[in-house]
Amino acid sequence: MPGVSVRDVPAQDFINAYAQFLQRQGKLEVPGYVDIVKTSAGNDLPPQEAETWFYKRAASIARHIYLRKQVGVGALNKLYGGAKNRGFRPHKHVDASGSINRKCVQALQKIGVLEISPKGGRRISENGQRDLDRIAAQTLEEDDE
């Protein structure tokens, strides 16, 4: 479908489709510690999906950067952070793990989806935009059927 972009597809459908694409492609460099690490200091446990959560995080980061001009790792830490349960005391926002987000961004940059922005942070590359639009069109076609 010509003219289909990531904005035209529901977020969850696109993220799942792009994560499956990244996993099938096998080029995304996954750190060895992803099956035991927590994603934030505010979390009690690591993610339930030990094999696929890193691909979903990378797909979500790619979509987030696609929808904006450029994004840095600090903004991603704030985005993926959440409330820390402090018992009887009020909840407070805790940023997500910077290491995980940095490794996702570096892996996406290595396969050519992202590039360094001269203004700071990362932005989507032309090849990355083409890939994401192609996956979005395929996802939209599957939803129509």
UniProtKB/Swiss-Prot annotation:
Residues 123-134 have a biased composition (Basic and acidic residues). Its main location: cytoplasm. GO terms for biological process: ribosomal small subunit assembly; translation. SMART domains: Ribosomal_S19e. SUPFAM superfamilies: Winged helix' DNA-binding domain. GO terms for cellular component: cytosolic small ribosomal subunit. Residues 120-145 are annotated as: Disordered. Keywords: Cytoplasm, Ribonucleoprotein, Ribosomal protein. GO terms for molecular function: RNA binding; structural constituent of ribosome. InterPro entries: Ribosomal_eS19, WH-like_DNA-bd_sf, WH_DNA-bd_sf. It holds the Pfam family Ribosomal_S19e. Belongs to the eukaryotic ribosomal protein eS19 family. Component of the small ribosomal subunit. Mature ribosomes consist of a small (40S) and a large (60S) subunit. The 40S subunit contains about 32 different proteins and 1 molecule of RNA (18S). The 60S subunit contains 45 different proteins and 3 molecules of RNA (25S, 5.8S and 5S). Component of the ribosome, a large ribonucleoprotein complex responsible for the synthesis of proteins in the cell. The small ribosomal subunit (SSU) binds messenger RNAs (mRNAs) and translates the encoded message by selecting cognate aminoacyl-transfer RNA (tRNA) molecules. The large subunit (LSU) contains the ribosomal catalytic site termed the peptidyl transferase center (PTC), which catalyzes the formation of peptide bonds, thereby polymerizing the amino acids delivered by tRNAs into a polypeptide chain. This is Small ribosomal subunit protein eS19. It comes from Candida albicans (strain SC5314 / ATCC MYA-2876) (Yeast). The lineage of its organism: Eukaryota, Fungi, Dikarya, Ascomycota, Saccharomycotina.
